[in-house]
Structures are given as C-alpha cells and as structure tokens.
Amino acid sequence: MIGCGACEPEVKMAGGQAAAALPTWKMAARRSLSARGRGVLQAAAGRLLPLLLLSCCCSAGGCTAAGENEETVIIGLRLEDTNDVSFMEGGALRVSERTRVKLRVYGQNINNETWSRIAFTEHERRRHTPGERGLGGPAPPEPDSGPQRCGIRTSDIIILPHIILNRRTSGIIEIEIKPLRKMEKSKSYYLCTSLSTPALGAGGSGSASGTVGGKGGAGVAGLPPPPWAETTWIYHDGEDTKMIVGEEKKFLLPFWLQVIFISLLLCLSGMFSGLNLGLMALDPMELRIVQNCGTEKEKNYAKRIEPVRRQGNYLLCSLLLGNVLVNTTLTILLDDIAGSGLVAVVVSTIGIVIFGEIVPQAICSRHGLAVGANTIFLTKFFMMMTFPASYPVSKLLDCVLGQEIGTVYNREKLLEMLRVTDPYNDLVKEELNIIQGALELRTKTVEDVMTPLRDCFMITGEAILDFNTMSEIMESGYTRIPVFEGERSNIVDLLFVKDLAFVDPDDCTPLKTITKFYNHPLHFVFNDTKLDAMLEEFKKGKSHLAIVQRVNNEGEGDPFYEVLGIVTLEDVIEEIIKSEILDETDLYTDNRTKKKVAHRERKQDFSAFKQTDSETKVKISPQLLLAMHRFLATEVEAFSPSQMSEKILLRLLKHPNVIQELKYDEKNKKAPECYLYQRNKPVDYFVLILQGKVEVEAGKEGMKFEASAFSYYGVMALTASPVPLSLSRTFVVSRTEVLAAGSPGENKSPPRPCGLNHSDSLSRSDRIDAMTPTLGSSNNQLSSSFLQVYIPDYSVRALSDLQFVKISRQQYQNALMASRMDKTPQSSDSENTKIELTLTEMHDGLPDETANLLNEQNCVSHNKANHSLHSEGAI
C-alpha cells in the first residue's frame, strides 16, 4: 500500500482509463446513486477496490504503456440513411430483412478495428428482481450497476469488415441483414460490444497492461480474474441499442407484371386525356356540319362519333372518372415499386404530364375526329364500365346545366370566323364579300345606301316630251325617273322610260298626260328601314324604286315628312355583293362618292336625230289635214284621183317639210324671207295657204290684192311648161275657182304605165318617160320639158304669220310614180317596197347619209323578196 504512494499518479491514471473503458458501468452507477442512495455507491466502490490495488502495484513502465494504448469507447449508433424500410421508431432502429444498412458509430478512439468490437444478439438483457437477493449472504449487484455479459451473438446480422473513419470520433460501418425465419414477421436484436483486460503475471512480479482492451494474463495474483477477462461481450447500456428487423416489403404484383400494368395505365391515361379534349371539342353542331359537307372519310368519322357525343355529360363523366382512376392506380403502383413516396410522386407526375397529357392532347387537338372514331369502341366500353358512377352524375348535370346545344355563331362571330380563316379556306374574295354583305344586310338601313335627293335625276311635272326632253331622259341612263312639282322634295309621280315607247317627240306630249295614264304608285319608306326588309318589299314586285323619307320634328311647328333621297333594288344588290354594278349608261362607280367611271366613253349624243329649225314639222289638227286633203283632191286637177291616188296624197301631205310656217316680221316687211314667190325668179314648188294672209302683186300694172286660206299658187311649177305663162294662165284663183289654165285638161285619163312588171328596173330617166303622157295635152310630149323651170310673173308676200303647204316638183313626181305603182297589180310586199322607195325620194337635192342608209336597207329587204327594183338616181 505504501509503495503505492509513489505510484499514485499512475494509479489515478489507470483508474481513469478503467473508468473510460467502462462508460456504461459509470452511467449505471450514476443512475444507481440517484435511485438507491449511498449504499449502492459504497457497493460499487467495493467492487472497484481490486482494480485500484492493481493500479497501485503496477510498475511505472507498465503505466506508461497503458497510457499509450487507449481503449475504444462506443457511445451509440445511428442510421446513416433513412427510407421507408430503414428508420428510427421509438428509439429503436427498424430495418428490413435482406437489406444492407449503413450505421454511424459514435465514440472515442474509433479506429479501423472498431467494426470487430460490435455484434448483435437475439437475447434481451436480463433484468434482476428484488426476490433474487440472498437472505444470509452478501447482496448481489444491482441490475444496472455494472456491465452484463451478452448472450449468444446472432449470425443473422453480419458486420462487414470495413469502416469509414471521421476524426476518430465516428465512423460508418455497413451491416447485412439476413432473411427472417419462416413465420416470423419481425425480430429484435440488441447491441453488444467487446471488452478485453490484461492478465497479471504469476507471483505478482510480472508487468501487465492496466488498460481495457489490452491482452494480458489470466488475472492478478491472489485475486480472482474479472468476468470479462480476455475478450468479453457485454450489452451496450445506451438507449438506442435495439434493432428491429421487419419482414421484407412485398410488391402487390410480380415486378414484371407490375411494369406492364404501369405502361398500360400510362397509355390509358393518355387516351382518356386525349379523348376528353378531342371528343368534347367536337360539339354536336360541328359533327352535323361535317356529316353533311365533309369528305367521305370525315362523314364516316362524324357518323360514328355523333351518337356518343350527343350524350355529352355522360361521356364527360366517364372519361374523367376513367382518367382519375387510371392516374391514381398508376401512382400506387409506382409507389410500390419505388419504395419512396417522394420518388413515386415525382415519377408519376413526369410520366402523366408528358405521356398522359401533353402528347395525347397535342395529337387529339389536331386529329380529334380520326382518333375519336378509331377508339370509339374503347370509349363505349369504359362508358359501360363506369355506368354506375358516371350516369347518375351526368343526369344531375343535365338537370342543373341543361341539355348541351353546341357552339352557335351569331352574325358578328360568323363574319369574324370567315375573316380569320380566310388564309386557310378556299373562298375567293368575291365570295367572301357576298357572304359578308348578306350577313350585314340586317345591320344597315336604307339611309346608308340611298342616293341623296340632290344627286337624283328628276324631271318636273310641267315638262313637255319633245325631242330635247326625251334626249335628256335617254342620256341620263335611268329607267325610273321621279317627277316633282314645285320643289324637288315634292315627288308626285314616277316615269318609266318604257312608258315613252309610243310617244313621238314631234307630238310634244305633256308629261302629265303620260304619268296620269300609267299612274305608277309611289313607294315611300322611312330612313331607318333595314335593307333586308327593303329587299323583301322589292321582291314583292310593287316597285324597284322607293322614296326615302323621315319625320322632321325639328324647330317649331308640326312634324312633317322630309324626303331624303331614293333607294333602288340595284342599291340593295350592290350592298349585298359589296361591289358596284356598272351598266353602259353609268357615269359614276358610286353614287355617294361620285367617283367617275374611268373607262367610260363619251355619253351618247342624240343630236344627229334632232331636226333643225328649218326641218321642224308643223303640227296641224286632224280636221285641217282632212280639209286640206279633200280640197286638193277635188279642187286642184294636179292632185285629183285621176292623177294621184288619195292614199298617196295623204302620205305626201304628212311628209316632213310639206307643211311649213312663216313668221312675219313687222320691222322687215320687204325681207326676202317674207316672199313666197318673186317675179321673174324661177321656182319649182306649189304653195297652198292654210292660215294667214298674203299679198299678190301681178301684171305690169302691179295690181295688188290680198288672199287668205286655201288660195294656191304655182301649179305650173309642178308640170314646168316650156314657156312662162301669164297670170291668167297661172290661174290665180280664189277658194271657189277651179284651176284650168295650163293644166293637162285634154288628156284627163292618162294611160296606165305600160311595160312595168316585177323585173323592171326604173331609172330616173325611165320614170320621167313613164310620167310624160300625163303632163302634156298632145301625144308628142318632150321629156326635155322637165328640164324647164317655172318663172312666175307675180309676187306673193306674207302679211301675217303663215301656215302653208309647199310641195316641190320632185315630191310631186315621186308621188305620181307611187300612185302608178299602187295601181299596178303586183304582190303586196313589192307594192309597199316600191311605194316606200318612191316616197323616200321626195326630198329636194341629193340624199343625205340617213336617206342613203334607209335606201340601202330597203334595197336589201327588196332583194330578199326577190324583187329587182333599185333606187338608183334617187334625188
């Protein structure tokens, strides 16, 4: 004991090392102290006495060696990685069979051999009870007061022979867990660690190691060896030394079958998602349209899909229910394979998004009709499978939301759809304009398309339908012309150009006569009338022109109807086709913008048909025409029926320029224009006064007297006797006198023209020869007599405005020729042709272009009738 004083530091060091080698025992001692008091502490000190004695007796060299070889101290274990099969539960490690688990070892002096000092046992640490204490002997040690030897170490858990160190305070070891025995669901294992102590030499003289973990002798001389001499396995006294091995997790299905099911479910998920988009995007209206106007393949597809698509809510519920069921099952199977919830969620999300949503929806959005038709049997199958759940829900949706109608486009949407799809459809611009115009017909009013009143061509009701007025109407190009009285806004009648078909401009008929006769109704419409309603009115046939008016209630006074303009059927049609209708008479492309037609030639000029002032036909009453005709036929021998037929005479009197007028000028009474005849000036015409007064100056004495109506002069000018005749021989007579002098009275019954037949060709000389027997009083008439001129020896001057008959020699001779043709027996066609040709030649002088054209046309008609009569030499 004394000698031990010098070794006190070594003893203390050895005692400290011993204490470090037994951490679990120290912790047990502390718990015993707090639980049982000082008695327990004294018992623990008594058990440490041999160790203290051993430390005191050790040599200085031995103590130094023990200090250099420190014992490994294991404090506890933790799982390095946790998952669904390896985790901490209630302070115990829970792992699965047939797995390898990495454990982190915490302690002191962790080295490469630490893995060999760890083991597990199946036997739980034995706990002593108070009944086990001896009655007469010394008290047994407390259950928790010191280390306890482990039971049999298990071979179900194998410590793999390697370790990963970290600063000698921790390291990672790996253990392999064998399968559980049959019928075992789980099994508990407990941690054991190894302790090794040096054995003392015999006789006490040997030097032995005093540290835990050294290899020494069997014990100290005179003392029994400790129970953990050599290598001893004891229970680890920590709280996390229990390991529970559970049964290996089994898959719901075999792995290969589970992979097949996952692939199939992924395909079904994509199919449900694609059909949901593809079929539900095909509304019933679109399917009906495709059935009627699609291609043959599209019609077949739509016919197969339409019965299923008609049950919209039922189809929707079936597809959604199937999609949700498939996606849920897919996630469960992936979780079973992956073994981790997070991994299953990530993998299932990626798979469903890519292969179950994006790809199928991208395909079905473009080819939904074909995909839906080719998979219709699968759709019907799943509708039957989900019938118990989806059908009631669909009926509930039908009751709440109503029956599905489909996409219906209004006018604006339809127009916009046509505009947007214009690059992709086969509509040409004109077709698109017509469709657009027809759809916009109900949105526009007549005020938008009407012609304003200021731009309308109108005619006053006081107008006279003479050549100028009718030419103006024809040049306007309009077929319906409003007629107004007073102001232009006071439209009272409507004139159709076809009403003027039987109106002669020479008749100067008042416009009111025509409008009252036809009495076309006026059609008034209000300015807010829609174009579709206006079109329906025009289609009824009442009128193709309407007068636009509005109620003017501005200012003071009563409201009144104000005429704004006119609208026609052409305006409505132009609005429908979105284009201007240009005919040959239009001057403007648009009656609102007043843009003129670029290619339009000059307007038609009717001035070529207008008579000059000298050619203006004088109008006489039918009664005066009859009296004039009877007077000439009975009183003037040259116009008697024996010389000229009454029919030809009537045509002659109706011929232009036969009846003329002369305006008397009071300021210039002696003007040459006032003389009908002047002495010693040759003339070739006959004059019959119809109205007015004339002064006749005759003879060398210059006798003057006045004459009035139905006095006639110049009969000899028609026959042109070779010598001038005196006044007595020119029979200046009154109304009751008969012209006898100078007339061919000797031969009142001239012979009929001989040698005339259908093949005769009458030249001018032939006609003169044919008429010669009627113009002389003897059988020896000279054709040269026609070349003579008549020179009167009197003057006839107007005293007032005159209206008279003036027949030239040429007109008279042509009338005689026509009379002879009329008396000649021949076909009616030839007769009419010859008479017309003869009367056409009654103009003085050479024929103009119009006369030549008419002669040529008559000749063509005559040749077609196989007649050879020509008009050569017509003057």
UniProtKB/Swiss-Prot annotation:
Domain of life: Eukaryota
Main location: membrane
Positions of transmembrane segments: 251-271, 339-359, 369-389
Domain CBS: 450-511, 518-584
Subcellular location: Cell membrane
Phosphoserine modifications at: S761
Family of this protein: Belongs to the ACDP family.
More about this protein: Shares weak sequence similarity with the cyclin family, hence its name. However, it has no cyclin-like function in vivo.
Protein's recorded name: Metal transporter CNNM2
The species this protein was found in: Rattus norvegicus (Rat)
Primary gene name: Cnnm2
